Amino acid sequence: MTITPQNLIALLPLLIVGLTVVVVMLSIAWRRNHFLNATLSVIGLNAALVSLWFVGQAGAMDVTPLMRVDGFAMLYTGLVLLASLATCTFAYPWLEGYNDNKDEFYLLVLIAALGGILLANANHLASLFLGIELISLPLFGLVGYAFRQKRSLEASIKYTILSAAASSFLLFGMALVYAQSGDLSFVALGKNLGDGMLNEPLLLAGFGLMIVGLGFKLSLVPFHLWTPDVYQGAPAPVSTFLATASKIAIFGVVMRLFLYAPVGDSEAIRVVLAIIAFASIIFGNLMALSQTNIKRLLGYSSISHLGYLLVALIALQTGEMSMEAVGVYLAGYLFSSLGAFGVVSLMSSPYRGPDADSLFSYRGLFWHRPILAAVMTVMMLSLAGIPMTLGFIGKFYVLAVGVQAHLWWLVGAVVVGSAIGLYYYLRVAVSLYLHAPEQPGRDAPSNWQYSAGGIVVLISALLVLVLGVWPQPLISIVRLAMPLM
């Protein structure tokens, strides 16, 4: 197979991020300079984002048997790059107070971003597995980056061991699917899995094991046990990446698998996914009710958000609207999570031991950092799905898709879950406006809005509000990603 200039243009984001990894590695070997390496990383990620315009001009194509570049891949690549950029900008002030090696942080984020881009373009079970490993392995190091803290190290060990187990399930499931179908390409799977084939025990077992592996990576019930501990133990900028980039990339590739291979046509698989979605929505919200740690609360709430997205995935067979729903919901979830975790990162910067993540640290924040408190309020309202925010548009889409596909009990679960979610999100928002404690705890720097992280947080809040009132630009972008399938 010959690689043409057209193919190289299609692979630009992947090549640019890969080149940035090499440049940052050489820069660290040459001389440790925190500012230089952070700047190189941000320039590389921005260049990869800009290159998406050229990719769009090249059109949709299968670059290799493992990768397909089209509108869908571009949308998810863009979301992963935005999340990686935000992670780097939040990490810079946080690392300023960190006494050990700072520069490797950016290297690990870039390698994980590379895995995310590979997942967005994956068109084959081999590239799906490679992408998941490429995004997971750097996260083992990132979660335990504050290794002098017992909690961070414990979170890293938990995540490493459980992630390895999940990967083995995923790989074994792929082996069974291959044994039955004789191919690993998504398109070939779609052709080979004809009538009645999906009821073969070996194939059902294979897809079942794959659901276990992917369910762990997406922290769906009952494979979610690592989520709250890892979110709490990981440094705040890493929790940002975990909650956004890794979830978006993996959900994107699962979406593509379901589009090409008729996995959702099997009644057994649909029932299993529906039960997982129902349990994730209800359990995630109920567990978040009693949390007094913001990162744990956001960890449990992410379980329920993935449950909502699963409703749209189950309804995928009913039409293109569910693809639109997932795109809009993930964009809303990305900006809301970036804002919420960004506030936690700003409150925890520079590094001074554990993050400012207890609810008590945010009590009365409005009285000395009013804009920051307003941003956090907007993010909580968006995550709760209150009208006039982007979170509401996403949730409305999911409900519409559920109704269209007659998934009545899942629609009921979404409504009940949203009602429960409203309580704990508003609890965080209300605590920002209570009387400040006598002895103030951690606080964001007074000039936070002029820092790169502060600007990212403000832009996220602005996007959540503007797109919540006028979502048409976002819907148009998501629709552009559809016809190129």
From Swiss-Prot:
Residue intervals on the Cytoplasmic side: 29-34, 92-104, 148-158, 224-234, 292-296, 347-372, 431-454
Q: What broad class describes the main subcellular location of this protein?
A: membrane
Q: What is the E.C. number?
A: 7.1.1.-
Q: Output the GO biological process annotations, alphabetical, semicolon-separated.
A: aerobic respiration; ATP synthesis coupled electron transport; electron transport coupled proton transport; respiratory electron transport chain
UniProt catalytic activity? a quinone + NADH + 5 H(+)(in) = a quinol + NAD(+) + 4 H(+)(out)
Q: What is the effect of changing K158C?
A: Shows 50% of the wild-type rate of deamino-NADH oxidase. Inhibited by 30-50% upon addition of 0.25 mM of decylubiquinone
The observed outcome of changing G391S is: Shows 90% of the wild-type rate of deamino-NADH oxidase
GO CC terms of this entry: membrane; NADH dehydrogenase complex; plasma membrane; respiratory chain complex I
The question of whether NAD is a record keyword is answered with yes
Listed result of changing M1H: Shows 20% of the wild-type rate of deamino-NADH oxidase
Further notes on this entry? A construct which produces a protein lacking the first amino acids has only 5% of the wild-type rate of deamino-NADH oxidase.
Subunit architecture: NDH-1 is composed of 13 different subunits. Subunits NuoA, H, J, K, L, M, N constitute the membrane sector of the complex.
What job does the chain carry out?
Answer: NDH-1 shuttles electrons from NADH, via FMN and iron-sulfur (Fe-S) centers, to quinones in the respiratory chain. The immediate electron acceptor for the enzyme in this species is believed to be ubiquinone. Couples the redox reaction to proton translocation (for every two electrons transferred, four hydrogen ions are translocated across the cytoplasmic membrane), and thus conserves the redox energy in a proton gradient.
Q: What does the similarity note say?
A: Belongs to the complex I subunit 2 family.
Question: What protein am I looking at?
Answer: NADH-quinone oxidoreductase subunit N
Origin species? Escherichia coli (strain K12)
